[in-house]
Swiss-Prot record:
Any GO CC annotation of this UniProt entry: extracellular region
Signal is among the record's keywords: yes
Keywords: Disulfide bond, Secreted, SH3 domain, Signal
Name of this chain's protein: Otoraplin
Reported tissue expression: Highly expressed in cochlea.
Organism listed in the record: Mus musculus (Mouse)
Pfam family, one: SH3_2
Keyword Calcium: no
Location in the cell: Secreted
InterPro entries: OTOR, Otoraplin_SH3, SH3-like_dom_sf, SH3_domain
């Protein structure tokens, strides 16, 4: 009986680990360079370290370059967050996309202006 219980619990852990979680929205709108929000807006450099509080965010180290893909529209006194990715040491090594506070970085180069205001969706705040 104990063996069956252990197998069931192990299966439950595997099942839960294979599914993501929809987290609370940080904003209902975002600014992007294009309608699909896939083009890079800018390249920014981190001015200080940042430890991600949950899976929606990314860890950033001072001096790292971050490619910015969207900028959340600030609502109800919330902080301003941008979505971006820190790339690895190798050119083809793409990092995980996540949010970080905009006041943490300084934009180094703007590729395209973020002029398209798009509603955020649940998938924008999905965590695996």
């Amino acid at each position: 009986m104990a063996r069956i219980l252990i197998l069931l619990l192990g299966g439950l852990v595997v099942l839960c680990a294979g599914h993501g979680v929809f987290m609370d929205k940080l904003s209902s709108k975002k600014l992007c360079a294009d309608e699909e929000c896939v083009y890079t807006i800018s390249l920014a450099r981190a001015q200080e370290d940042y430890n991600a509080p949950d899976c929606r965010f990314i860890d950033v180290k001072k001096g790292q370059q971050i490619y910015v893909y969207s900028k959340l529209v600030t609502e109800n006194g919330a902080g301003e967050f941008w979505a971006g990715s820190v790339y690895g040491d190798h050119q083809d090594e793409m990092g995980i996309v996540g949010y970080f506070p905009s006041n943490l970085v300084k934009e180094q180069r703007v590729y395209q202006e973020a002029t398209k205001e798009i509603p955020t969706t649940d998938i924008d705040f999905f965590c695996e």
